[in-house]
């Protein structure tokens, strides 16, 4: 620590009072009047030992400056061995570079290493320190910023060596400093596991008894020995071989754990196979109920999600089995009771589940047949009521048909069909067959959830065109309102148009004068028999129109659908 204080105090005394940036001068030294660059990047004057000493004192925070402090104590030495020192660097640097892996990247580090090995061997000899000054000047010129920052990085670790040897002379910190720096440079060159080994080497490599005067050949051999020791890595290799053994222990434990984990997964796969065979999750549910949490205890340490997945499969299986319970109202109560009886208890096995599957399939067929029978039972009742109303109508069938078509347009809003023409007269006569054919279609399913009166009205609307299709031999014309019919009744629908109405007025003849102008009174006579059975909930309120006169009721019946359509 004394060395740092000496270096820090001397430049403060030498700097003039006008200087402000003291830290910059501590790092880069004083600026010469003739050059714009700091002297640390320049070349020292080899002849002026005083100048080198002053510049070295200014650069106190770098190891180069610390090395100059060691050299400053020997200012009296002249560069007598300058030529011999110049020959040392070119001989050492190639030998060290051959040992390094990367020649281009580590060349500067190798040069600094070779230089400090010289300082280490010749630190105590006063005659060689002048040689070190000249040699250091040449090596610093080639080293550049990389060597500078590498040396600055390890300046803090030198304090431990200095604390141990505070009572020693100035030359001994100079000896300890290069030896620790060689260790640091070797650590930079080698892998990260080597600093412990290299620190041991740095302490071991310091010679206890070194002759004061040695020749350049001895210095070369010592540099080669240091570089070879750095390449041998005998203690580090032992550590490297020991570390994989330590790492193998947790890896072996992990492998054992991984080998133990797939066992519960195999059990879950077998359970899934049983589930696929039975078609339901009853067998797995029985194992969970009887065994308690035995399966869960096996699966929780490995994968806790497996238990939840098994429970989910049970739920899905029961949903699939009880899917038929959500049936329409027409299904008998006995059918629901059969479903409850078919659900197996908790102790049921795969055979019971197969029976459940067979019974559910049979029950589906029974349901289809029952629904078809119910449909057939409803539709004959519809058709039986039609002739009664036909007798009451008498001569007004054609007008009732026209009236019904206009009224149906306001109810069935989600069916669209083009305007029928003469080519569609023949399909109208097949309306009864189409009604029986649609018992299993989507329209029939729609009728399940509608009023029975509406379905009877559909059959009633469909029956008259069978006998009165001859009253409509008209070509297609523009309709007053778009026609919307069911798929089963699409052939029996005839749109209301202005040109259709006068044709029927000629057949009736009684109301021809008013019918040709407005077309309203013609369906008036058919209003009373029509409203006995309401077509839909919208038209139920027209039952109260019985007390109204025929003309007023006809106008209201014609205008209301037109309003709703718009």
From Swiss-Prot:
| Region of interest (Disordered), ranges | 120-176, 192-237, 277-307, 342-533
Q: Bias regions of kind Low complexity — which residues?
A: 464-476
The UniProt GO MF terms for this protein read:
phosphatidylinositol-4,5-bisphosphate binding
Polar residues composition bias: which ranges? 477-489, 504-517
Instruction: Indicate where this protein resides in the cell.
Output: Cell membrane
Subcellular location, principal: membrane
Alphabetical list of InterPro entries matching this protein:
AMER
Q: Which GO terms describe its biological process?
A: ectoderm development; negative regulation of canonical Wnt signaling pathway; Wnt signaling pathway
**What are the GO cellular component annotations?**
plasma membrane
Classify the protein's membrane topology as the record does. Answer: Peripheral membrane protein
Where is this chain compositionally biased, Basic and acidic residues type? 123-134, 155-168, 192-204, 364-377, 389-411
Keywords of this protein's UniProt record, alphabetized? Cell membrane, Lipid-binding, Membrane, Wnt signaling pathway
Q: Does the keyword Membrane apply?
A: yes
A family per Pfam:
AMER
Q: What does this protein do?
A: Negative regulator of the canonical Wnt signaling pathway involved in neuroectodermal patterning. Acts by specifically binding phosphatidylinositol 4,5-bisphosphate (PtdIns(4,5)P2), translocating to the cell membrane and interacting with key regulators of the canonical Wnt signaling pathway, such as components of the beta-catenin destruction complex.
Q: Give the family, as the similarity comment puts it.
A: Belongs to the Amer family.
Q: By what name is this protein known?
A: APC membrane recruitment protein 2
Originating species: Xenopus tropicalis (Western clawed frog)
Name of the gene this protein is made from: amer2
